Amino acid sequence: MENITHEVNENVDIVVIESSISNKNLGENCLVQELYRLKESSKEAVEGLGEFTLFKKYMHIERESQRQLEKLIFKASKSNIAQLILVCGSVGDGKSHIISYFKNMYPEIMKKFILHNDATESLEPSKTSMDTLNEVLNNFSDENIENSNEKFILAINLGTLNNFIDSKYGERFSKLRKFALEKKILESNIEDNSFDEKSSFQFVNFSDYHLFTLEDGRANSSYIKSIITKITDSSEENIFYSSYKKNCYECDNCNVCPIKANYELLRNEKVQESIVDLFVQCIIKNKIIISTRALINFMYELIVPRSYIDVNSTRLKKDIRKLHNLDYARCLMPNIIFNHKELSFIFEALNSLDPLNVRNQKVDDFIIKFNNSTDILPYFKEYVDFPSGYIEKFKNIDFGKTEDTRIRYELLKLFIRGYYVCGKGNIFSLKDRIFESYIQNLYFWNRGDKSKLKNLYDNTKNGILKWNGESEKDQINIFIGKNQIKYRVSEDIQLKVDTSNLPRNNDVELKKFGTVMILKYKSEKLNRSYEIEVDFSLYKLLLQVIDGYRPNKKDKNHFIKFIEFINKLSETGSQNEKLLFTEKNRDVNKKYKLEYDNEFEFYRFVEI
């Protein structure tokens, strides 16, 4: 008999409802009804380990984590010893969806296993979640595991696993604790999780797998694109496309409906690639974790502009017909993507990537040209790959006569954002070149390709040496005593790169990888190395420092660990033997050195 617990907000992957949105006014003829299946707050958005519906089967997409878990389950089912498979991860990452999928696909094999969904609530009100885990895992305790032949799959969040092995029950499960620590399950390290036939413990950590992969120095996501394709694909199985084809063409609002327009735009391959790129940027730059549940809900928010349209209104279609030009422009997908941080944490991250914040000479020149033009729609036709009729609603506006500057401004925003997601031609660049170089370095670092990493290590070293201000080659400025107004104080330091910690991975496409790079340096004076974790924010800041930027107080508060790292390296420099002083703000800045003569035991201060 299966031992299953459920948690309302925990084990969710594919978000569905089995009945259409309740709106009698719509009848059975609106795309919104089917799109509502994607909404996170829908009636049946919660998924445990139970029924795997036809719609879930349609939306299911195979992932690498699924393939790894499948291998473990197949081998564990044939083992002669007890087997506990830890399916670890975070909220909404699809643990229960995949287990539910296996139950449906391999019922005979899954019958051999007891299944348990970790939950913050216990089986009984009087018991805590720790009490429950202690009870259900009894056969895997130190005293029972050798005599057990039980097969058990535990879907558990990393935080709960950590709390359990550190709880009062940890002593009973010291072997499980040892396994978790040796495999570094609770750390950010990427460890091998292949089946160990001599062990009763196996694991797959969903947190090791990202929504994207790295290949040839670029990020890709067949997973995100597959989810979009499930929504937009022109196949008979696709209920969304079937509804669009059946209802949208004949709808009275077909030429003025932003929902139809956004659905059509989402079918554009350029748009899909841009969405993938934006998601990768959100994950790397903002360090957010995007679950499949949140991803699918995002697709709903992307198509349905609920900030301007109430889909539950009995006047929905009339309201759409009455949308004025300003709100219609705001309802279009490029504006939705970047302009609604209130919708979710994903939209909040996207708001920080708004291409309206990109300023360069070509962008500024275009804005002037756009604002002075009496006919702006040709710009869209020439440079933005919108579907036919996407901005048809604006064709009758006489921009030479209208005094309403707001509509021109909204269309300017629509153009720049639209050019970002599906532009054509080469009118200006909105690319983040620093991010592109970070992804390239991240790929080569995770592969351990030393020949491609010299610039990364050199740039980081230069950033370290210039963090406290411009200095001579192989010198670093230090702060001693009072704040020096007249002199800059420096020391000699010889930093050497240490690549002993580089990962080793010969795969061309990386499916398991770290999203930060751990770089090591050592001084020639000491054999000991110090390491620093370089994420995108630090990577970008160091490049700015190399170009002359001086970190401010906010930067120093944000990168405390990096400052501690610099201080450790500084202690290995020449400060105990020689200091260099350079005058500031003079026509000719003189240089001096203070050094200690070991032979005669005295200090000497001389001009260089």
What does each model-identified segment do?
Residues 95, 124, 160-166, 212-215:
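Switch/connector loops and helix/strand junctions flanking conserved nucleotide-binding motifs
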Residues 1-82, 433-439, 443-444, 448, ...:
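A short, basic N-terminal segment
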Residues 183-246:
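Conserved small helical "lid"/interfacial subdomain of P-loop NTPases
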Residues 147-154, 200-202:
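Loop/turn-to-beta-strand initiation segments
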Residues 397, 412-426, 445, 487-590:
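C-terminal structured domain segments
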Residues 105-139:
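AAA+/P-loop NTPase substrate/partner-engagement loops
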